[in-house]
Amino acid sequence: MNVTDDPGNAAPGMLELVRRFVDTEDLYNGRDALADIEAATAWLAGEGVLSNDRPITAGGLDALRNLRGAVRTLAAANTAGEEAPREAVEAFNDLAARHAAVVRLDVLHGGVAASLRPREDGAGGAIAVLAAAVHQAVLTGTWTRLKSCANPECRWLFYDESRSRTARWCSMRGCGNIVKARRYREKQRRGT
């Protein structure tokens, strides 16, 4: 069964890019769109995050994977309703500090529009865009709704649109049913 084909609800704005980025590692099906430099370059270019389809370096690939792991850990804390682990926060902060974005103002329809632009191309630029998206999500209050599936075999990121903000599964039809059925069978075996 391929439960991760249904990623659930899309996150708002650039947080959706962050969700898709973390989900480049499909733990359930054993696929990784950041498996190597070529695959990572293709994924980032396809998402419009990599300037000029510029290939990334081995160090850049490691940094992208570290960012992905930190964001997945932070989203798991959202799922559990726990404080974010310091190690993940520090890893995120370190990567964001090394790969910064700058504020750019443009005239738009007689007014001014602001945007964040990465200072560099390649993996560093992609990290800057992703870090800026997380920053924006924290400011707008949408960050706490980005969660990691509670199925340890999946951990797919999803956007929790429930009123109570207590969703735990990327898909109730998939992971929710799988985990609940597993728990039921375990209880039956134990006789409780």
Predicted segments — roles?
Residues 1-148, 155:
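Short helix-coil boundary/hinge micro-motifs
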Residues 129-185, 189-192:
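BZIP DNA-binding basic region
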